[in-house]
């Protein structure tokens, strides 16, 4: 029996029957990953322009990023933009995560007919084109003078991150036995305490909103600027107004950081299970 004729599962499906699916998956992964990976060697180029493949290798653009605070022109202060993005992303965690988690918990335990109505409303920011959300936020913030403010950025990013948290937590709760919480309550624990000590630890690794906020660009373009410009907004403007290879260095750092956080999250999630 050849390798392609071996059974893939107990349903008698053979590897040959799925070969086309594996090939298609490899092609899709290639098209998704390779364009992102090209930016990595470009970040080590010594050229003044984005160049692939690099003719000469250098760390000059990483140095330009980490020491950009020494540049008098605020447009090139990448570190200030990075600090703003980190601050907004952390604050978004404390806004979007509790709201999304409690909403998911309430919907998962609800037997009301309103559940079918509330869920689409809560995930509507994901369904509506993000450009429309950004325009709406801009005109709303103008009325309250919240444009270019940290609070405005946090609320805007939370609006986008909350539906993602809601969906992920609801998915995690489907695999969670709610009887564990009922047992805790029968032993004298209050409902909030049972949720915090029994339910929350088993779904905590499904709570992600940091990366959603850190990578967000559309809302940032409309409601941030000046001293409160985010790193993604600064990258977009630099790519539009000038060819700065520092963007490739920052992109490489973001790719490595995001991938590392996702891997750690998956490892911790698997370990907790």
Predicted segments with their positions:
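C-terminal transmembrane helix and the adjacent membrane-cytosol boundary/short C-terminal tail
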Residues: 1-10, 20-23, 170-185, 191-192, ...
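N-terminal, non-cleaved signal-anchor transmembrane helix
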Residues: 1-83, 264-273
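Transmembrane-helix boundary motif in ABC transporter permease subunits
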Residues: 3-14, 89-122, 135, 139, ...
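Interhelical loop and adjacent transmembrane-helix boundary motif
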Residues: 13-18, 47, 59-73, 214-264
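Faces of alpha-helical transmembrane segments in polytopic inner-membrane proteins
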Residues: 31, 92, 99, 122-132, ...
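Membrane-embedded alpha-helices of multi-pass transport/permease systems
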Residues: 34-37, 41, 98-102, 118, ...
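A structural signal for multi-pass alpha-helical bundles of membrane permease subunits
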Residues: 34-47, 84, 134-144, 153, ...
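Membrane-interfacial helix termini and adjacent extracytoplasmic/periplasmic loops
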Residues: 50, 54, 59, 114-116, ...
């Amino acid at each position: 029996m050849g390798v392609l004729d071996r059974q893939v599962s107990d349903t008698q499906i053979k590897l040959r029957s799925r070969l086309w699916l594996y090939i298609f998956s490899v092609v899709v992964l290639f098209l998704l990953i390779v364009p992102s990976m090209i930016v990595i060697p470009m970040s080590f180029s010594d050229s003044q322009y984005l160049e692939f493949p690099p003719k000469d290798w250098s760390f000059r653009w990483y140095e330009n990023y980490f020491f950009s605070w020494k540049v008098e022109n605020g447009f090139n202060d990448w570190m200030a933009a990075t600090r703003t993005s980190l601050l907004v992303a952390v604050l978004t965690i404390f806004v979007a995560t509790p709201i999304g988690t409690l909403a998911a918990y309430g919907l998962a335990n609800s037997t009301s007919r309103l559940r079918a109505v509330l869920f689409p409303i809560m995930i509507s920011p994901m369904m509506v084109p993000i450009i429309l959300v950004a325009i709406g936020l801009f005109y709303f913030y103008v009325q309250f003078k919240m444009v270019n403010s940290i609070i405005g950025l946090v609320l805007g990013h939370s609006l986008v991150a909350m539906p993602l948290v809601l969906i992920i937590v609801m998915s995690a709760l489907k695999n969670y036995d709610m009887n564990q919480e009922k047992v805790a309550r029968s032993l004298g624990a209050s409902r909030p305490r049972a949720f915090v000590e029994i339910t929350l630890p088993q779904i905590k690794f499904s709570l992600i909103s940091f990366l959603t906020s850190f990578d967000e660009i559309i809302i940032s373009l409309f409601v941030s600027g000046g001293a409160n410009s985010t790193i993604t907004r600064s990258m977009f403007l630099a790519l539009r107004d000038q060819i700065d290879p520092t963007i490739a260095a920052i992109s490489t750092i973001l790719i490595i950081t995001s991938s590392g956080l996702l891997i750690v999250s998956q490892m911790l999630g698997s370990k907790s299970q």
